[in-house]
Amino acid sequence: MPMNVRLQPQVNISGDAERAAQGFGRVSRETPPAFDPGRQGEAAAAFFESHGYVVLSDCLSPGELAFLNTFCDRTQAQMPEVWGLGERRKPHHRNQGLIYSQPLLDHPELDPYVRHPRSFPVVARLLGGEERVRFAEFNLRETPQGAGAGAMNFHHDMVREDRLTRTPYMPCDWLCAIHYLSDVIPGAPCFCVVPDSFRYASLKEAYVGLGEGYREVPLYGQAGTCILYDTAIFHTRLDGDGDRMRRTWHQYYARGGWLRSALPTTDRYIRPPASVLTDWNLFPERLARSDDAATRLFFSHWNTAMGEWAAGGFDPAVRAAMPRGEQ
């Protein structure tokens, strides 16, 4: 791997640039609880529902960690361009350091991970049941050693406007599972959240609205740790010392199905299925057209690009012409 991959620093526009390079500089020293999903799934879900995120411990075995890290090492060596290690780095590479956006398309050996037995039951609980969970995205990322400080702005991912006022709030519409593939200790780039911020339209509104409760919480953990977060919560990659690396697996899920009114006097629909997360993500034919009905349902959340690719018989040329089609 070349050693000249550098993050492009952002200007702090989400918070207060006079106070900090990221956010408002109110970085918490607290260590949030970590839950064993096998024994504490209900408690983990309750924590998420209250705060918009939860830390799950020991979600990947040593063998799984070795497999995924070997996969990353091998594909970086054999297909450097898909990670952003070639001469022409795409904007999404520059924002993330290194990212392999769509590894599922060509690597069925990753299929067992999309509904991982440690984290997926908690995901299903949060989205309203296993039959409500839809696949959205699976990617692998790395902040390379010596990449410097990126000063990524705090942001939320995909949101629905009704999140600001709806009652009840849950189930959420999208959530992401970040699995640490390397130890994330102080000094390393770290996933960082603003708890309880999913009801706010901007970080500045959250800062005012949460008052003394506003805090930016770094989530450190050993390799195998999983963090689930509501895509409406404000979060960032908190810079470390600019030298240490971090490697992660990110998987996004969407909520499927129509939600009925909670009122006993009506059965009208009140919330539609979550919309598609991106306009470019594609699903492998082997999964989208699986013989297994539950797998087909899980991979049924198609965007227009996916629909056009399927209509074209999953033609490789159609895929290659799409953004990130071969990345």
Annotate each language-model stretch with its function:
Residues 60-62, 140-145, 159, 183-186, ...:
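Short, solvent-exposed loop/turn segments at secondary-structure junctions
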Residues 147-220, 260-267:
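Catalytic core of non-heme Fe(II) oxygenases with the double-stranded beta-helix
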Residues 3-33, 226, 233-234, 238-327:
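Non-heme Fe(II)/2-oxoglutarate
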Residues 107-112, 213-217, 236-238:
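Active-site rim elements
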Residues 2-50, 57-162:
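Non-heme Fe(II)-dependent double-stranded beta-helix
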Residues 138-140, 177-179, 249-253:
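A structural signal for short, well-ordered beta-strand segments
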